[in-house]
Amino acid sequence: MERKITTFGTYFREFMASLDDKAQFKINQGLLLLATQPRLSTKFVKSICDGLFELRTEWNGNIYRVFFIFDNGNIVVLFNGFQKKSQKTPNSEINKALKIKAEYYGSKK
């Protein structure tokens, strides 16, 4: 099984550009797993709400999250990402991702 990974807007590219090469590599490894594996454990993927998921990556003591949705069953659309600094995913980041999701579906009409 292979999913096509696409991005929407510049949110994800801007996030990746803010990271060092090793952190980018780790996130890309997570994306490769997401693209090629039929199921991933909650260590890597967590359902947030309303069809929104987060890809979970750790590198060098830092925790990174990238929001995505499934579109048409096999397309993964990457939204914003952030470096996590607390146990709980901040509501502000979730709300930002939900706004981007609405923007994405609005652009498909």
PLM region spans:
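Residue-level signal for short, function-critical loop segments
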Residues: F82
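Hydrophobic/aromatic beta-strand elements that line small-molecule binding cavities or substrate pockets
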Residues: V66-F67
